Amino acid sequence: MTELQQIIEAAFERRDSITPGSVDAATKSAILQTIDLLDAGKARVAEKIAGEWVVHQWLKKAVLLYFRINDNGIIKGDDAQYYDKVPLKFSDYTAEQFKEAGVRVVPPATARKGSFIAPNTVLMPSYVNIGAFVDEGTMVDTWATVGSCAQIGKNVHLSGGVGIGGVLEPLQANPTIIEDNCFIGARSEVVEGVIVEEGSVISMGVFIGQSTRIYDRETGEIHYGRVPAGSVVVSGSLPSKCGKYSLYAAVIVKKVDAKTRAKVGINALLRSIDE
């Protein structure tokens, strides 16, 4: 455990007594350093280690403490003013800093301080919350939302209106994770710490939480909380045991590998679900 982590862990135990006016200098410095690490992508709330996702709960604690040490203040926008505890990530960026970051930010896209946006990423008018990690080559399309501490992989496309759930409380909950080379269709929602594994394609209007049944029509398996790698997923339903009604489910209609994805467009994969 690093010294920074030790300070954060100790401060979190007494978090109810921490205010902007009472926080000691060492604790405040540790919190601000941690937020800077998240902001720069030098630390991330979750990372894949030896093939398994590991969540660093102390970083989530630092984010929660960051709210405790900040007063609300005016945040200026182009046409409006805002009142919040967390500053905006790009509010003081110069043209040179944007070039160095390699990020394109289309107005009125918003990213909060403490989120990381990797090079070669495009933010259309969208929202990226504190603690989130958006990796290289990703498109966050119009009105998409990347929730607090969510992890978005390389070369991901979050289509218009997509919602990727955030998670700060309860503290033990895992962040929502979209792995590399995934496509999330318009107006879909992935929440509650669900993991969409590498190379998956989620069709338009699919809603997946921890209780959502994810049915593989080829094998008959039902998954919860995880979309297996290379899945093509559409909205569907499964019959009840009594046969009197059906309930919503996400349906894996096929599996694809990287070679197939390279040769066949996303639309072709989704249009051929009955083959």
Curated annotation (Swiss-Prot):
Catalytic activity: (S)-2,3,4,5-tetrahydrodipicolinate + succinyl-CoA + H2O = (S)-2-succinylamino-6-oxoheptanedioate + CoA
Recorded GO CC terms: cytoplasm
Superkingdom classification of source: Bacteria
Binding locations of substrate: R104, D141
Pathway: Amino-acid biosynthesis; L-lysine biosynthesis via DAP pathway; LL-2,6-diaminopimelate from (S)-tetrahydrodipicolinate (succinylase route): step 1/3
A GO MF label: 2,3,4,5-tetrahydropyridine-2,6-dicarboxylate N-succinyltransferase activity
Pfam families registered for this protein in UniProt: Hexapep_2 (PF14602), THDPS_N_2 (PF14805)
GO BP field: diaminopimelate biosynthetic process; lysine biosynthetic process via diaminopimelate
Class in the EC hierarchy, top level: transferase
The EC number(s) this enzyme carries: 2.3.1.117
Subcellular location per the Swiss-Prot or TrEMBL entry: Cytoplasm
Main location group: cytoplasm
Keywords of the record: Acyltransferase, Amino-acid biosynthesis, Cytoplasm, Diaminopimelate biosynthesis, Lysine biosynthesis, Repeat, Transferase
CDD domains: LbH_THP_succinylT
Similarity comment: family membership: Belongs to the transferase hexapeptide repeat family.
Subunit structure of this chain's protein: Homotrimer.
Protein name per the record: 2,3,4,5-tetrahydropyridine-2,6-dicarboxylate N-succinyltransferase
